[in-house]
Amino acid sequence: MKSQDIRKQFLEFFKSKSHTIVPSAPMVLKDDPTLMFTNAGMVQFKEFFLGNSVAKSNRVTDTQKCLRVSGKHNDLEEVGHDTYHHTMFEMLGNWSFGDYFKEEAISWAWELLTEVYKISPENLYVSVFEGSDDRDDLGLDTEALELWKKIVPEERIIYGNKKDNFWEMGDQGPCGPCSEIHIDIRSEEEKAKTPGRDLVNMDHPQVVEIWNLVFMQYNRKANGDLEELPAKHIDTGMGFERLCMVLQNTQSNYDTDVFTPLVGEIEEITGVTYGKSEENNIAMRVIADHVRAVAFSIADGQLPSNTGAGYVIRRILRRAIRYGFTFLNTKEPFIYKLVPVLSGQMGATFQELKSQQNLIENVIREEEASFLRTLDQGLILLENLMKESKDKTISGEKAFELYDTFGFPIDLTALILKENGYDLDEKGFEAELKKQKDRSREATAVSAGDWIELNPVDEESFVGYDKLEADAKIARYRKVESKKKGEMFQVVLNKTPFYPEGGGQVGDKGILMSSDGEVVDVVDTKKENNQIIHFTKNLPKNTEAEFKAIVNKTERYNTASNHTATHLLHQALRSILGTHVEQKGSMVQSGYLRFDFSHFSKVTGEELEKVENFVNARIREQLSLDEQRNISYQEAIDQGAIALFGEKYGDSVRAIRFGDSMELCGGIHVKNTSDIWHFKISGESAVASGIRRIEAITGEAAMKYFEEQTNILEEIKSGLKNSNDPVKAINNLQEENINLKRQIESLLKDKAKNLKSKLKHEVKSINGVNFLSKKVDLDAAGIKDLAFQLGEEIDDLFILFGAEQHGKALLSCYISKELVKGKDLNAGQIVRELGKYIQGGGGGQPFFATAGGKNPDGLNEALQKAESFIK
């Protein structure tokens, strides 16, 4: 059975059980402070489990793309080394929100596996929660046990502990016991030796969990206590790749048609055959898995970067590159070539892979090229560390510096050291890594208290599109603490005009004012699990009072101006550069706007001018806002609205139109484009391969910019001889400056020529080396030029020049190439050693290197010590 058919049968089965099929949510999460990636099928339904929203359908099913690489669900290090862990995977699931419970969940799971997929019951085992004797004091899940007894023999029921059979969303929130279904796909001979039940949850590659049925019936409070949920829910998840392994009768997920096209392409590109060597097998599995994770992340809008979710994606891709580099001998970018195979294989189910294919290929290719350069640099640095080591051991601190500063993988460091007979201080490295993780954890740790319910509401009313003020009451609040922001309060109102951060737009600020005049500042607004959360530094004295919720008008108007400008900018770019342009990210706040978009070359000055003129023309046209709320998604698309990639849209959406610009958008906008006043581009740059960024200002910021430019112009004119024609006056100054530079260069050349003749007579021979150590009055470029000229005329030459420039010290070392080879001299090592005398450091090539320092008084001692390197 093909994987596409397996997926389809699952969804159709639950559709026949009155479930609504819903699309996968994005794998990359944008508005969830607790998660960077969707790591389970239930993530997109958290708001229903938490009771913050009411589901439109109380029975749903889907296939959800997931990523597990960090935190509690961290499968990264296992990936490739076994045959059933993955970073990116599909989770097939069915959910009940307060509708059916254990009986239906269990019976339907068994029906699908044994009657639809025709899996032999003889190969299946099930587990139930055995209870716990800790502070929760939970008993055996007798309800699930009795239900399973009606279906399977008792010897196939396993009693599981809290670790395996009690599922929790996190430190707080809905949770409950679960039943896992495991399958034994070993040979009959192996089954006869060891019963399958003895291998359940023992990390056996052929006795694996395929389905987890979670019975959400409790809520974990901030103090650790459990309480019964008012409504009970079902949350199930089945690993699609593992199911394919079972139904396609293979011994590995990587032998299914989910992975074989990718593995085959890797074989074709590298010339290495899968199955001949375990090292090669692991490398191929790592690459086949990781390209999926990276491609889906980029398709969902997350580019590789040095922070947050982007860093996780970069780390996954670099792990794949490193395995190819080390075990498949790939020294050129090649992983990007797998993207068309992946797109052809999964693009029908996940359309974003097809629509974003060019971008994915370009980003991966550029990342590969960049990291391969890093690997080359790291190899040189590691080689130098080995040469400097006297006891054939590289310290954990140095290895961590290679890893942290230069991005050089620690396991590659360990492998190279081992091959060269060196040891790595692994404990020292782990200690440094732990310090870094502790610092990061401490900086980002947030502790949250329980919600205090005052005036419970099913769903908060947002009135911010029409009003900047609203009468409100506090529905609930809780205290949160973090090292970065200290103690704060999260407040949920029954009605609010405050727009929460989302869609690239920052959250509103403002105040809550009680009837007796007390004012509480709202410093930020965010959305979490479908709740609009207002962040305050303190609570009002009377939390039961009625309040005026008032948004900061100035910040709101400026932000709205910038947001509308991004829509006009998007239209301008598509009109001038081409319809290939797609928005890839944005930041809209009161002071400026930032807009990222797909385009594969630098935007020229002429093109930027056209873009700016296009937007300002729309501003002068005084286009009115045409807003459609609660329009169906399909109707909006049919009208020509642009939907942004990586965004999750519901059945009904909000469409924003200004003239011919129409986009799906939940943000705040001006009523008329004339309110923007003016649009001015302040910068254009590259974000990643195929992604450009434009920064711009509007309104008050643009007005202030023009005032500053006018003042600068007046200041320039006042300092010129011809203030009536400043351009001509500046051209004259530039021409005069060029002539003076030429004269100075000519004088310096004469000086260096005379100095070279003089220095040739000061060279002395020591142990077969022509040696010169001298303080000179030249800049860095002049010193380098002089050293190489002397090197061309004198063989076996060792030079150390010192110079003082602008109160700083400079050392430059030149060594003839024959000395580098014959005497094992290294200019880079020498300047690093001598740099301590000038309170500085440096490096470079073995034949030429420089060091800078803040202590010119140490130059003479450094110059004197140079001779010791050849004695």
Curated annotation (Swiss-Prot):
Enzyme Commission code(s) on record: 6.1.1.7
Keywords, comma-separated and alphabetical: Aminoacyl-tRNA synthetase, ATP-binding, Cytoplasm, Ligase, Metal-binding, Nucleotide-binding, Protein biosynthesis, RNA-binding, tRNA-binding, Zinc
Record's GO cellular component terms: cytoplasm
UniProt enzyme class: ligase
The keyword tRNA-binding is assigned to this record: yes
Binding positions for Zn(2+) per the UniProt entry: H563, H567, C665, H669
Pfam families (alphabetical): DHHA1, tRNA-synt_2c, tRNA_SAD
Primary location recorded for the protein, binned into one broad class: cytoplasm
Biological processes per GO annotation: alanyl-tRNA aminoacylation
Cofactor: binding details: Binds 1 zinc ion per subunit.
Compartment(s) of residence: Cytoplasm
Gene Ontology molecular function, alphabetical: alanine-tRNA ligase activity; aminoacyl-tRNA deacylase activity; ATP binding; tRNA binding; zinc ion binding
Domain comment (free text): Consists of three domains; the N-terminal catalytic domain, the editing domain and the C-terminal C-Ala domain. The editing domain removes incorrectly charged amino acids, while the C-Ala domain, along with tRNA(Ala), serves as a bridge to cooperatively bring together the editing and aminoacylation centers thus stimulating deacylation of misacylated tRNAs.
Family statement drawn from the similarity comment of this UniProt entry: Belongs to the class-II aminoacyl-tRNA synthetase family.
Function text: Catalyzes the attachment of alanine to tRNA(Ala) in a two-step reaction: alanine is first activated by ATP to form Ala-AMP and then transferred to the acceptor end of tRNA(Ala). Also edits incorrectly charged Ser-tRNA(Ala) and Gly-tRNA(Ala) via its editing domain.
This protein's name: Alanine--tRNA ligase
This protein's encoding gene: alaS
